[in-house]
């Protein structure tokens, strides 16, 4: 299954349109949104709250393909503007035999791993920096990954 991940859009309609273009080009089966979708304090302070509605409209066009979790900036108002659920702190997905734990990153991250007794792929945003890492639990070695 082909997946696309995005995080920390923060109500930026321009970059949300870029995301939609990439989604339409790549045609993944699911778009996984890792939180902080609409809220942007700087947009509100400059009287550009309509960016929030524009961004919501762009995302709502893709609602049938979206799986989303709550970011630390997502609010009940954001949920009211979106036609898909965003208020879960995390979701677990099984994709092609792989266990994914998707979250925003403010609650679970490489420093505070999610509770699990099996191997999971932790996917999160929040840092605004793309990075990949492998973490071994105490009972694991690279040989049994």
Give the predicted meaning of each segment.
Residues 2-95:
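Core catalytic region of metal-dependent phosphoesterases/phosphodiesterases
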Residues 9, 102-107, 120-130:
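Histidine-centered catalytic micro-motifs
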Residues 134-141:
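Conserved small/polar residues in nucleotide/adenosyl-binding loops
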Residues 21-22, 102-117:
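Pre-active-site segment of Zn-dependent metallo-hydrolases
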Residues 89, 118-120:
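A generic structural signal for short beta-strands and their flanking turns/coil linkers
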Residues 77-82, 112-117, 131-133:
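Short loop/helix-cap segments at secondary-structure boundaries that form the rim of catalytic
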Residues 64-67, 99-100, 120-121:
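Short active-site oxyanion
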């Amino acid at each position: 299954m082909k997946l696309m991940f995005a995080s920390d859009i923060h109500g930026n309609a321009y970059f949300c349109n870029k995301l939609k273009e990439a989604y339409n080009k790549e045609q993944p089966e699911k778009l996984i949104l890792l939180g902080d979708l609409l809220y942007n304090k700087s947009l509100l302070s400059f009287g550009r709250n309509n960016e929030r509605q524009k961004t919501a409209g762009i995302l709502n066009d893709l609602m049938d393909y979206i799986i989303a979790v709550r970011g630390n900036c997502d609010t009940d108002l954001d949920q009211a503007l979106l036609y898909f659920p965003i208020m879960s702190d995390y979701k677990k997905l099984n994709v092609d035999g792989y266990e994914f734990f998707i979250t925003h990153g403010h609650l679970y991250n490489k420093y505070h791993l999610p509770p699990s007794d099996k191997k999971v792929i932790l996917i999160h945003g929040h840092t605004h920096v793309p990075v990949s890492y492998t973490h071994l639990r105490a009972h694991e070695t690279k040989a049994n990954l």
